[in-house]
Amino acid sequence: MSFWLPSQGKLYLPPPTAVTQYLDTDDFVTRTDTFYHTNTERLLFVGHPYFDIKREDKVLVPKVSGSQFRVFRLKFPDPNKFSFPDPNVYNSDNQRLVWALRGIEICRGQPLGIGVTGHPSFNKFKDAENNNNKTPDQTTDDRVNMAVDPKQVQMFIVGCTPCDGEHWDVAQACDRLEPGACPPIELKNTIIEDGEMCDTGFGNMNFQKLQASKSGAPLDIVNQIVKYPDFLKMGSDPHGNSMFFYAKREQMYVRHLWSRGGTIGEEIPPNGEASPYYLPGAGRATLPTSVYFGSPSGSLVSSDQQIYNRPFWIQRAQGRNNGICWNNQLFVTAVDSTRGTNFTISVHRDKPSLEDQDTYTAAEFKHYLRHVEEWEVSLVLQLCIVDLTPEALAHINGMDPRIIESWNLGFIHAPNNIEDQYRYLQSIATRCPPKEDAAATEDPYAKYTFWDVDLTERFSMNLDQYSLGRKFLFQIGKKSRGIKRSAPKAVTFESSSRSKKAPKRRRKNV
């Protein structure tokens, strides 16, 4: 006998609306065999490693730390305004030219060194690692002078839009918070700007709002927002503009285990009753603090583990943008804490120079801190052609309409009727002058802080005259146009160890 049974399997239907299809730049961009080299000048930074030195809200000495992000905004010339030797490079009626990144080398100067950061009033109550004695009672102020070496970070992100960062900040509470309650926190995404701090081993959060004691972090981050690149968001970007590729190397270990001083906000549960976490003992009515933390340490720095001072070649980017520099610009976000040495400069309080008979007195000398950085960026760019097809224009317009506006495609406007033209616009006898309709093109990143580097006049087709250019020519199998050298003459030497053979005698016919 047969029975009818309902189907146990699930039926999956496609989504009612079609999924948006994003074009890859290789679908509508044609690459040429024309390459250019460009590089920045030597970019130098000098400042105080912990904070800005101000006088009446004017920055006298800026903050320059080895754990700061450096964001270089490299501006390129418009290739559509170039004069090429071959006039038939592209058809200006239905094509436009753009730059594509093929190679980059980020160079760092200065010797390797470990930076030191700290706080003269650091909230370190008791050693929780090797605690031989019982925990003493807390006093009103148990803060100490403490210094650590930050986490070792080497990282750079390359894209045609700024790098996205993430940090934890105070969130909006559903109900009114009571005094002393822990605020809710949320993950926020913001653009990483030049001079902002990276993670030094204390986390990526807003220390200005989440550290009310001003003693839970070193001086360089205690009043700052520490950010970390949001690789997940940039990796899933449908356009792939913010991150063509990245390279990073992080290293840290916990050097000491300490505990915080103060009142515990959340005690070990349950409060005042038998706890599943510990057994009460005689002579211990109250437990010591359970707020632990570790002091970071970046450990050894070595030239064997460096991502800088070496070229990187882009064959295929991680996203859909395969290295096309839209709007003729490139953003390089970098950080390097392996050259974090802080200079200690000492000067006499009264005398400009000391004499041989002077003696040392500690109070007569003033000590200053300075940190210096040295950067240089070299690029190899490839000239590419964009076909102005409807699909390509629709894709570019949805991504960034400013790109099409900068191309001056020359759309024909509808004819207007005759308009009135007054001669004396500023005269009080006539009407007020009308407002200008065509507003100037605004920079979308004007409110952000970057290091703007103008490379419009630093392009060269002679790649063999530059170090990165010669490396690139070797990669693609082209010989550099150098001076031909004559081949050395071959010289042979006879070995003295070989015995000379006697000449053979001819046999006489008998």
Swiss-Prot record:
- State the GO CC annotations: host cell nucleus; T=7 icosahedral viral capsid
Q: Name one Pfam family in it.
A: Late_protein_L1
Stretches with biased composition (Basic residues): 498-510
Keyword Translocase assigned:
no
Q: Which GO terms describe its molecular function?
A: structural molecule activity
Which keywords label this protein?
Capsid protein, Disulfide bond, Host nucleus, Host-virus interaction, Late protein, T=7 icosahedral capsid protein, Viral attachment to host cell, Viral penetration into host cytoplasm, Virion, Virus endocytosis by host, Virus entry into host cell
Where is the stretch described as Disordered?
482-510
A biological process (GO) of this protein is:
endocytosis involved in viral entry into host cell
Q: Which Gene3D superfamilies match?
A: Major capsid L1 (late) superfamily, Papillomavirus (2.60.175.20)
Localization: Virion; Host nucleus
Q: How does it assemble?
A: Self-assembles into homopentamers. The capsid has an icosahedral symmetry and consists of 72 capsomers, with each capsomer being a pentamer of L1. Interacts with the minor capsid protein L2; this interaction is necessary for viral genome encapsidation. Interacts with protein E2; this interaction enhances E2-dependent replication and transcription activation.
Sequence similarity: Belongs to the papillomaviridae L1 protein family.
Q: What is this protein called?
A: Major capsid protein L1
Query: What species is given as this protein's source?
Result: Bovine papillomavirus type 3
Taxonomically, what lineage is the organism?
A: Viruses, Monodnaviria, Shotokuvirae, Cossaviricota, Papovaviricetes
- The gene name reads L1
